[in-house]
Amino acid sequence: MKSLFRPMIVIFAVLAALTGLAYPAVMTAFGQTVFHNEANGSMIAKNGKVVGSRLIGQQFDAPQYFWGRLSATSPMPYNAQGSSGSNLGPINPALADEVKGRLAALQAAGHQPAGVAVPVDLVTSSGSGLDPEISPAAAAYQIERVAAARKMNVSDVAAIVDRYTRGRQFGVFGEARVNVLELNLALDDAQRG
């Protein structure tokens, strides 16, 4: 009986050391040396102060800023601790109310492009409720409002949007997108500079 326990204990100790200590230590060292920024949350700093992450959206509702997707987290928007599945079904009355509320906010802000449908990502939330990016169509839809609020030329704001529009990942995966935080920070810099 004793002869059975010794190999089990040795195997347990070896696997615990490998999977609980060695593997996490190697992966942490690899992440910190090769992917330092990503391993630490892809933080964005301005003037030595962290202002956000490229990976988690932030609440912007002032007219001089581009607005991101709706956040479905609670008790406050873009709360990473409250992230969970948030997709409502197409016939759910709560989704219709959410869309109507966001449409009303967009109309109240003014400066909608004539004859252009509101992009769906401006009136619906993402699956996680934390999406930091919008489609180029959603950014283009807001250019006139942002330019008017900042007293900037529409073409200047459009050029900044173009500069911050990223294509598909590796040219294949996903869709083109614009990081809202990076775009808004670039607009602040352009207006100051």
Swiss-Prot record:
Functional description taken from the UniProt entry: Part of the high-affinity ATP-driven potassium transport (or Kdp) system, which catalyzes the hydrolysis of ATP coupled with the electrogenic transport of potassium into the cytoplasm. This subunit acts as a catalytic chaperone that increases the ATP-binding affinity of the ATP-hydrolyzing subunit KdpB by the formation of a transient KdpB/KdpC/ATP ternary complex.
Transmembrane portions of the chain: 7-27
Cleavable signal peptide: none
Membrane association type: Single-pass membrane protein
Record carries keyword Transmembrane helix: yes
Single GO molecular function: P-type potassium transmembrane transporter activity
Keywords: ATP-binding, Cell inner membrane, Cell membrane, Ion transport, Membrane, Nucleotide-binding, Potassium, Potassium transport, Transmembrane, Transmembrane helix, Transport
Ion transport found in the keyword field: yes
PANTHER family reported in the protein's UniProt record: POTASSIUM-TRANSPORTING ATPASE C CHAIN, POTASSIUM-TRANSPORTING ATPASE KDPC SUBUNIT
Subunit structure: The system is composed of three essential subunits: KdpA, KdpB and KdpC.
Membership in a protein family: Belongs to the KdpC family.
Gene, per the UniProt record: kdpC
Localization of this protein: Cell inner membrane
Protein name: Potassium-transporting ATPase KdpC subunit
GO cellular component terms, semicolon-separated: plasma membrane
Main location: membrane
